[in-house]
């Protein structure tokens, strides 16, 4: 494992392994904790990205960096384009914006903004909801924040698609900023309710309850609407599947569901 806050560690890893492309998925992602631990979030989300970018520039290698929908304020009512003005409203979004700006100054960098990332592994919204449903615990989920869930497998496949382009054509023709999420949008409540419905457990299936953001106060403010416009993907061409189709795929692969 490489510590991205240690530039010497990155440089050594690149030299020892003859790296040609770096894909940076590392980030400080605890949105609420970032409000009180801003320095650490900044060190990772900005300082770490600066280190990666500088090493990539030093060796002339490509950088693919993952960013977030939280660079927007969420006050729009239409999908945000890559050209839309950024205005983060929390510390997490602010540090991620600083990082992506630095990366985009490098001509061999690709920055991919994504949103509501989940998978059947680790700790994320999906696994939290599955655990709550299996444990038959009532859960209030906000119904007035809208975005696009993104299955981590689908994001990974898009990244692989970009990397494989270097075998077909110059990847440098496709550097810059892109948005990638699964198609469609929903509220967090819709997402959670869909998980509950698709699980199709016997007996009661109403453990997920809607609530307003005002009823669920958090330390960090979150965008009310953060749907990302993916028009730029069509130039490849590349079209992500709908978030519900991706969710079904995730749940089919989830061993925890099979066990319960």
Predicted regions and their residues:
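NAD(P)H-binding glycine-rich loop region in Rossmannoid oxidoreductase-like domains
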Residues: 4-44
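SDR active-site strand-loop-helix element
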Residues: 22-26, 63-68, 73, 112-114
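NAD(P)-cofactor binding segment of oxidoreductase domains
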Residues: 36-64
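Catalytic helix-loop patch of NAD(P)-dependent Rossmann-fold dehydrogenases
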Residues: 43, 48-51, 71-112, 116-119
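C-terminal amphipathic/interface module of NAD(P)-dependent oxidoreductases
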Residues: 221-260
């Amino acid at each position: 494992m490489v510590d991205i806050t240690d530039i010497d560690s990155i440089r050594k890893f690149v030299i020892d392994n003859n790296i040609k492309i770096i894909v940076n998925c590392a980030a400080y992602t605890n949105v609420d904790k970032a409000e009180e631990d801003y320095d650490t979030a900044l060190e990772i989300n900005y300082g770490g990205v600066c280190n990666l970018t500088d090493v990539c520039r030093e060796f002339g290698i490509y950088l693919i960096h993952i960013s977030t929908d939280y660079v927007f304020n969420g006050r729009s009512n239409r999908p945000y384009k890559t050209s839309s003005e950024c205005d983060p409203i929390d510390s997490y979004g602010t540090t991620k914006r600083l990082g992506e700006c630095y990366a985009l100054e490098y001509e061999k960098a690709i920055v991919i903004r994504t949103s509501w990332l989940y998978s059947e592994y680790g700790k994320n919204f999906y696994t939290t909801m599955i655990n709550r449903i299996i444990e038959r615990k009532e859960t209030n989920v906000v119904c007035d924040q809208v975005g696009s869930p993104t299955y981590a497998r689908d994001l990974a496949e898009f990244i692989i698609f970009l990397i494989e382009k270097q075998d077909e054509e110059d990847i440098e023709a496709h550097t810059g900023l892109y948005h990638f999420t699964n198609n469609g949008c929903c509220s967090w409540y819709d997402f959670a309710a869909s998980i509950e419905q698709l699980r199709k457990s016997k007996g009661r299936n109403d453990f997920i309850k809607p609530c307003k953001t005002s009823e669920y106060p958090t330390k960090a403010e979150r965008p009310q609407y953060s749907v990302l416009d993916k028009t730029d993907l069509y130039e490849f061409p590349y079209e992500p599947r709908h978030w519900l189709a991706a969710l079904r795929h995730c749940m089919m692969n989830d061993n925890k569901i099979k066990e319960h």
